[in-house]
Each structure stands twice: as structure tokens, then as C-alpha cells.
Amino acid sequence: EIAFRNLRQPKENTGFVANYIDAAFNNCIFMWDSAFMLMFGKYADRIFKFQKTFDNFYSHQHVDGFICRQIEEDTGNDVFARHDPASTGPEVMTWCEWEYYLNFGDKERLSRVFPCLVAYHQWMQEHFTWRDGTYFSSGYGCGMDNCPRLDEKYHVCYSHGHMVWVDACMQELNACNLLIKMAKELGREEFIPELQQE
């Protein structure tokens, strides 16, 4: 009942392309919240295509692969600048799309979203890693803004604190493994060596 009260249609001039479920928080769609709502929504797929909520993130993907984790519903604007440690993540869309594929076998959708997911992962690898290849994030960026892990001089929601974030590393490792599975399923083996190397 709560979910169906929060179904939305795209507003004009927002760049949104599909009906979606809203987190009912602050007139924004959120990558993290959407992923978990879609995990539950898949059980009502015959009534409403909850998975298409992600299409509104893909339609806002920047040319270099970046996808903001929070997008305003009224304007379609990204809430955060791309290199802000709180701008994106966690990389849960890959996991959610794979789970959807396992449930419904929708290869057309998997084929359509795979390039978006690979480009997003490549952006994360390029811009959210330290020199040794480990990942950083922020409380908002990794979805764990209530974990007291930073020194007091850093803001838990917005700062990376110059640390390696083990949860961000594990999220990216999971995404790599799932992208490899997708590549095999779709016959896109050209992506596998780079993903395996990471």
C-alpha cells in the first residue's frame, strides 16, 4: 500500500523517461533507496514495472559514465557535483539489475543496461580510487552515513577522510563479479579481462 502511494510519473523537462517509485523523502530520487525498493518491487512486477525506476538514472548518465546518486524530481538536476565524495554510489544498480535478470530472464533489459553499468563502473574506478586501486567514498556515497569512522575534523556524510573505505571496495568487487557474469551471459567477453584484472 505504501509503495503504490509513492508511484510517480515523470514531470516535463526533467529528462526522466519512465514511471517510478519515489522514496517519499525530499522530492529526489536516490540510487541507494531505489535499489532496495526495487528488490521488493520485483514481486509486484506484473502490476508495475518498478525496475524502470533505474531508467531515470541511466537517462541522466553523463557522457563519461558518471551517474549522480541523487536527482531532483522537479528539475532533473543532479544534486551533487560529480567529484564530490558524496556525489555517487554505492554501486548497487549492478546487483539490483542482476537480481532482476535472475528472476525474470529479461535479456533485452540486461543488454540495454549493461553498457550503462560498465561505463558507471569505469567512472568509479577512474575517479573514486586511490593510487593503489582501493576505493574511497563518503557516508552518503556508500550508503552508511551513520557509521562513526572518520576523525572528528571530517564530516561523516560528505568527506572521504583520506581513508580506504572497505565497504566501497567490497561494493565495487561485487559489481565487477556481476559485470563479468553479465558479460558472459550477453556474449560481451571483451569486457572480462579488464574487470578480472581489477
Describe the function of each predicted region.
Residues 6, 10, 60-68, 127, ...:
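A short secondary-structure junction motif
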Residues 18, 23, 69-92, 125-197:
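The feature captures the catalytic groove of carbohydrate-active enzymes
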Residues 1-4, 47-58, 94, 98-101, ...:
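Hydrophobic core segments within long, regular secondary-structure runs in both alpha-
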Residues 26-30, 82-103:
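C-terminal capping/lid segments that line or modulate ligand- or cofactor-binding pockets
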Residues 1-29, 48-52, 56:
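Low-complexity, Ser/Thr/Pro/Gly-enriched N-terminal "stalk/linker" regions
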